[in-house]
């Protein structure tokens, strides 16, 4: 890890003792996991004390099912996702079994969050040429609530509206929290992992009523998507092997 990154991590750990600081290898990406009660205070300190003057992006994340190597779906065979996982014994995992999650380097298990919904903010410090990812988990899965950052970075207004619209995360203190992508009569939040892939209703223009109407979904066939799989990317291993081979040849 670069000395500059280590120094910055030490500064963050010293300034925010209740915040978890993690560094993703090999790129040295730094992430702060901030408790919900300290979300605004920590972000304000990052802006004022660490010169993170710009918030480039904010999004919501639904961790439902995260860490499960595979899970039961409908209308697929037991061999349907065999390219994504490797069994620990002869044969495949039986449906309903949830093997332990993989790892990012083959030694440590992935950290599976206890809470379902999180908010991620990506910050930039132009003065120090530095980027930082800040994450906050909502404590209530049924009604996820996180404080709004509009008083810290006013430009986050529409980002928070998007996260509210797509994930149902409520940003407390937001001046105008309403849907931004879906229409006003939309029911549910389409980026949640338990939202049906076909949707609930479809919209069309009714010639007789001379207006847009909602009708049950009829034009989309049910389908099964490929599940999120946590595994090592073989491309990086192959690239490392080729690099070692080239040095040996030289």
UniProtKB/Swiss-Prot annotation:
This protein's UniProt keywords: Cell inner membrane, Cell membrane, Membrane, NAD, Quinone, Translocase, Transport, Ubiquinone
Subcellular locations according to the entry: Cell inner membrane
Alphabetized Pfam families for the sequence: Complex1_30kDa (PF00329)
GO terms for cellular component: plasma membrane
InterPro entries per the UniProt record, alphabetical: NADH_DH_suC (IPR010218), NADH_quin_OxRdtase_su_C/D-like (IPR037232), NADH_UbQ_OxRdtase_30kDa_su (IPR001268), NADH_UbQ_OxRdtase_CS (IPR020396)
TM region positions: none
Topological type in the membrane: Peripheral membrane protein
Coiled-coil regions, chain positions: none
Signal sequence bounds: none
GO molecular function: NADH dehydrogenase (ubiquinone) activity; NADH:ubiquinone reductase (non-electrogenic) activity; quinone binding
Domain of life: Bacteria
EC nos: 7.1.1.-
Chemical reaction(s) catalysed: a quinone + NADH + 5 H(+)(in) = a quinol + NAD(+) + 4 H(+)(out)
Subunit structure comment from the entry: NDH-1 is composed of 14 different subunits. Subunits NuoB, C, D, E, F, and G constitute the peripheral sector of the complex.
Function of the protein: NDH-1 shuttles electrons from NADH, via FMN and iron-sulfur (Fe-S) centers, to quinones in the respiratory chain. The immediate electron acceptor for the enzyme in this species is believed to be ubiquinone. Couples the redox reaction to proton translocation (for every two electrons transferred, four hydrogen ions are translocated across the cytoplasmic membrane), and thus conserves the redox energy in a proton gradient.
Similarity comment: Belongs to the complex I 30 kDa subunit family.
Protein name: NADH-quinone oxidoreductase subunit C
